[in-house]
Swiss-Prot record:
BP term (GO), one: proteolysis
Subcellular location: Cytoplasm
Gene expressing this chain: MAP2
Enzyme class name: hydrolase
Pfam families: Peptidase_M24
Descriptive protein name: Methionine aminopeptidase 2
Binding annotation for substrate: H224, H332
Cofactor: Co(2+); Zn(2+); Mn(2+); Fe(2+)
Disulfide bonds: none
Residues that coordinate or bind a divalent metal cation 1: D244, D255, E452
Cofactor note: Binds 2 divalent metal cations per subunit. Has a high-affinity and a low affinity metal-binding site. The true nature of the physiological cofactor is under debate. The enzyme is active with cobalt, zinc, manganese or divalent iron ions. Most likely, methionine aminopeptidases function as mononuclear Fe(2+)-metalloproteases under physiological conditions, and the catalytically relevant metal-binding site has been assigned to the histidine-containing high-affinity site.
Stretches of the chain forming a coiled coil according to its record: none
Role description: Cotranslationally removes the N-terminal methionine from nascent proteins. The N-terminal methionine is often cleaved when the second residue in the primary sequence is small and uncharged (Met-Ala-, Cys, Gly, Pro, Ser, Thr, or Val).
């Protein structure tokens, strides 16, 4: 009974507690005088302040629209690719190399002893690696997982090439649309170079910018002409202008060129050279011999004739000009791609980058140096050379800081504030530290044209980095 009574008493006590009014929570104010009005006012102000702050935060910021390029191009290319990923060039398969069966006969109709010897070596090499069943080795590159892995490992390198190529496409589109008769060579070159610098947006010229001086070679001058200070040459209506400029990103140089005409007078020459360049690109690939590419280029080039003012001209490959491989900070990496038939059995290799360029001429098809020099480059691998002329030492320091082994021209030195440097520059050339590259010309009165693309031999494919909608 006692336990039952205690339970009833506990329930009654609980009911009494529940009937009491709810306790007022203690003030959290710092005031100890119990001034509730002040607290209410302060709380009201705080609430109002919070509302105001919330209103400010809730204001929607205007979304920035997509970046728009200016004319001339001045907006850095990175603003158009905020992910940092740049578009691929044109992707092609490597040429399908089918080895000859063992015992393949040597061509008995080779034109010279050198060519016969080269053919014999080629036959021996093919016989060594060949089999009774033709096998397309390069086709396997696109399905070999190891090659795909190697390709992915180089993604960052590919992206730097592609950034330079994108800058090149934007700048050359503007140049092609705006080069007009009456412009000076200086204004054309600077229009291109200013845009390259703006789109690269690099304070350090060794991290990105101009890959080499802009070539603006006219008519019978095929290459290596850019204006020096005071140049007054003006583009005329019937001129044939070769525009050759480069863009580099961390030493990876995109080298691409086109030929500009104001009318159709020499269009047949341009068509021949463009077709020859496309042949070179098509034939290029891993394990392809450079001499074979040259032979194919020459065959395409010299299948064309041009009729101008009632006279027919045979288009010729300029036999002492070549394409070349490109190494980091080195426009000519050591391998040459001939544009005529050659006994050169050197092969293209995986991972190499090449500038496939062809030059056609209505003249001799052979160039010599002539005229005032403007192009220079520090020789690769040159060691310490004792220089006695202080000005030469100072000039070399400027070259090292701003160009390294990238080509430069006298206008670039002028732009850096160098003065009275010609004797010092001559001293560097004579000392073997710097190489000069004078203009290259065919016979006067003829016309020359050029087209060029940069290609990269990836493990799985061939990428035409500089390909665009224009060429």
């Amino acid at each position: 009974m006692a336990e039952a009574i205690e339970k009833v008493a506990d329930k009654v006590a609980d009911l009494v507690v529940d009937d009491k009014p709810a306790a007022v929570p203690e003030s959290t104010s710092d005031h100890e005088d119990g001034d509730d009005n002040d607290d209410a006012v302060n709380e009201g102000e705080a609430v109002d302040g919070e509302k105001k702050k919330k209103k400010k935060k809730n204001k929607k910021k205007k979304k920035k629209g997509p970046a728009v390029q200016t004319e001339p191009p001045t907006v850095p290319i990175d603003r158009f690719f905020t992910s940092g990923i740049f578009p691929e060039g044109e992707i092609c398969e490597h040429p399908h190399k089918t080895f000859k069966p063992k015992g393949t006969a040597v061509d008995p109709f080779a034109d010279s002893e050198d060519e016969r010897e080269a053919a014999e070596e080629r036959a021996k090499d093919d016989a060594k690696h060949g089999s009774d069943d033709p096998l397309d080795f390069n086709r396997l590159r696109t399905t070999n997982e190891e090659k795909r892995y190697l390709d992915r490992e180089q993604a960052a390198v590919h992206n730097e090439w592609r950034k330079g190529a994108e800058i090149h496409r934007v700048v050359r589109k503007y140049a092609r649309d705006n080069i007009k008769a009456g412009m000076t060579m200086t204004s054309i070159a600077e229009m291109i170079e200013d845009s390259v610098r703006a789109l690269s947006n690099e304070e350090d010229s060794l991290k990105g910018g101009q890959g080499f001086p802009t070539g603006v070679s006219l008519n019978h001058c095929a290459a290596h002409y850019t204006p020096n200070a005071g140049d007054k040459i003006v583009l005329k209506e019937d001129d044939v202008l070769k525009v050759d400029f480069g863009v580099h990103v961390n030493g990876k140089i995109i080298d691409s060129a086109f030929t500009h005409v104001q009318n159709d007078k020499w269009q047949g020459l341009l068509d021949a050279v463009k077709a020859a360049t496309e042949t070179g690109i098509r034939e290029a690939g891993i394990d392809v011999r450079l001499g074979d590419i040259g032979e194919a280029i020459q065959e395409t080039m010299e299948s064309h004739e041009v009729e101008v003012d009632g006279k027919v001209y045979q288009v010729k490959s300029i036999r002492n000009l070549n394409g070349h491989n490109i190494a980091p900070y080195e426009i000519h990496g050591g391998k040459s791609v001939p544009i005529v038939k050659s006994a050169d059995m050197t092969k293209m290799e995986e991972g190499e980058t090449f500038a496939i360029e062809t030059f056609g001429s209505t003249g001799r098809g052979y160039v010599v140096t002539d005229g005032e020099c403007s192009h220079y480059a520090k020789n690769v691998g040159v060691g310490h050379v004792p220089l006695r002329v202080n000005k030469a030492k100072q000039l070399l320091a400027t070259i090292d800081k701003n160009f390294g082994t990238l080509p430069f021209c006298r206008r670039y030195l002028d732009r850096l504030g160098e003065e009275k440097y010609l004797l010092a520059l001559k001293n560097l050339v004579q000392s073997g530290v710097v190489q000069d590259y004078p203009p290259l010309v065919d016979q006067k009165g003829c016309q020359t044209a050029q087209y060029e693309h940069t290609i990269y031999l990836r493990p799985t494919c061939k990428e035409i980095l500089s390909r665009g909608d224009d060429y």
